[in-house]
């Protein structure tokens, strides 16, 4: 709306919004910035890397998941070798609240409970949990979890009711307050997890994006496969032979798999030019999913996974945290990286002795009136709302998935303060709105 401000800079425009007087566009000389980024990203991984490195091994006897090992460092108040920049938090101060209170694994607890309250403000869209990840990808269970905590020493299945804590559906699992060692016994918001900003895997995948943008396809593929080999524990799931848009799409997806819940995906989508397209795709998929749940009792994804309307759950004796799933037929171990800490051993008040949640039917359809369902109920399992609640609340979900996008031509608008330099040089033509400062 003020073209004279841009001087000789030219833009490639995807779409425009006359009402908001804005455009979804990129500079025509964007590859110059890719070249600059390539130099800095390569240095961050080599000459300027210092002691930082991708965590590719796991020395723990009870787990073999280098991806999770990175996050465990942070929960133990240590600096991971993979961390490049984090905002430091101090234990037992309110400034430490973000990943131990706002964004971690959901809990109904309060202060000094088992465990404390966690709002779980980051949720995974169910279609991505069920239909996005390869079932062999070790990142899925570390990144997202289907059970939360009641604050009284017990694990319990999340609901898809609109809400927080144990409502709201599948949530971020990279930071689980139960896994802190030593466990923080104190008031909520005080566990002291640092706030992550950038890590080595992020840099590797940004460099892959840059390489693909500069047509260095072989190098881009090699970078992506570094991340995939860690995620799967082998090279059998490596990508190969991709170029052009197919390669760029693969890199975009890899960043989603790797960086879920770390604050990158929306900006990745904006930068890719696919924000509005992806928003409409996921909403359409969720609409179809909800309809199938209502009419068929389940929804089947292209990878063969099934999201059912109901699951069967049972509280079982003991209190243990689980790790990589070694037996998918064990209803306590599958999916992995859930369970509950034995809070009674810490002297905290707990309810009962059956603290772990066994789940049957999470990835398959069990007809409620079937012989299988009857057998499970005879064993003490309880028919539990799962996808049925999601279907009943689908309008709430659809209105909150990338809101404001109404078509693939919509312009995604993010409001950032206009820098003082721009305001001062605009001769009064540019000002910050929304109550933002002018200087």
Predicted regions and their residues:
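Short, surface-exposed recognition loops and adjoining beta-strand edges that mediate ligand/DNA contacts
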Residues: 2-105, 233-250, 267
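Aromatic-anchored glycine-rich loop motif in surface-exposed flexible loops
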Residues: 1-29, 178-198, 207, 212-214, ...
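Extracytoplasmic/secreted proteins, especially bacterial periplasmic and envelope-associated proteins
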Residues: 32, 36-39, 43, 135, ...
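Structured segments of extracytoplasmic/periplasmic soluble domains
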Residues: 40-51, 207-213, 223-234, 250, ...
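Active-site-adjacent helix/loop patches that line small-molecule binding or acyl-intermediate pockets
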Residues: 252-262, 266-276
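Generic secondary-structure boundary/loop-capping signal
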Residues: 81-82, 141, 195, 233, ...
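Elongated scaffold/linker segments in the mid-to-C-terminal portions of large proteins
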Residues: 50-215, 272-439
């Amino acid at each position: 709306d003020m073209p004279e401000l841009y001087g000789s800079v030219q833009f490639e425009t995807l779409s425009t919004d006359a009402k908001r007087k804005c455009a979804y566009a990129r500079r025509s000389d964007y590859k110059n910035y890719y070249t600059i980024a390539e130099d800095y990203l390569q240095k961050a991984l080599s000459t300027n890397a210092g002691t930082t490195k991708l965590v590719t091994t796991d020395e723990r006897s009870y787990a073999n998941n280098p991806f999770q090992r990175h996050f465990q460092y942070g929960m133990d108040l240590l600096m991971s070798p993979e961390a490049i920049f984090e905002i430091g938090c101090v234990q037992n101060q309110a400034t430490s609240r973000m990943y131990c209170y706002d964004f971690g694994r959901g809990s109904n607890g309060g202060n000094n409970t088992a465990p404390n309250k966690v709002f779980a403000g980051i949720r995974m869209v169910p279609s991505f949990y069920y239909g996005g990840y390869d079932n062999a990808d070790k990142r899925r269970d570390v990144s997202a979890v289907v059970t939360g905590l009641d604050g009284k020493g017990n694990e319990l299945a999340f609901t898809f009711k609109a809400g927080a804590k144990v409502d709201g559906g599948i949530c971020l699992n990279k930071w689980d307050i139960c896994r802190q060692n030593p466990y923080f016994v104190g008031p909520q918001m005080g566990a002291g997890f640092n706030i992550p900003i950038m890590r080595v895997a992020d840099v590797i995948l940004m460099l892959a994006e840059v390489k693909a943008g500069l047509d260095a396809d072989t190098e881009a593929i090699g970078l992506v496969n570094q991340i995939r080999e860690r995620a799967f524990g082998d090279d059998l799931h490596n990508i190969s032979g991709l170029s052009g848009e197919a390669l760029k799409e693969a890199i975009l997806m890899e960043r989603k798999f790797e960086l879920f819940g770390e604050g990158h995906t929306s900006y990745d989508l904006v930068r890719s030019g696919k924000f509005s397209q992806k928003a409409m795709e996921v909403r359409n998929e969720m609409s179809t999913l909800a309809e199938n749940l209502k009419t068929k009792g389940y929804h089947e994804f292209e990878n063969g996974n099934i999201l059912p309307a109901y699951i069967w759950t049972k509280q079982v004796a003991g209190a243990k945290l689980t790790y990589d799933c070694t037996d998918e037929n064990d209803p306590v171990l599958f999916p992995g990286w859930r369970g509950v800490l034995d809070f009674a051993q810490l002297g905290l008040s707990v309810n009962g002795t059956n603290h772990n949640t066994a789940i049957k039917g999470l990835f398959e359809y069990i007809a409620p009136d079937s012989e299988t369902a009857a057998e499970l109920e005879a064993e003490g399992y309880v028919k539990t709302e799962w996808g049925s609640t999601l279907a009943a609340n689908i309008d709430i979900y659809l209105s909150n998935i990338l809101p404001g996008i109404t078509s693939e031509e919509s312009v995604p608008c993010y409001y950032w303060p206009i820098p003082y330099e721009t305001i001062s040089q605009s001769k009064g033509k540019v000002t910050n709105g929304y109550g933002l400062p002018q200087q």
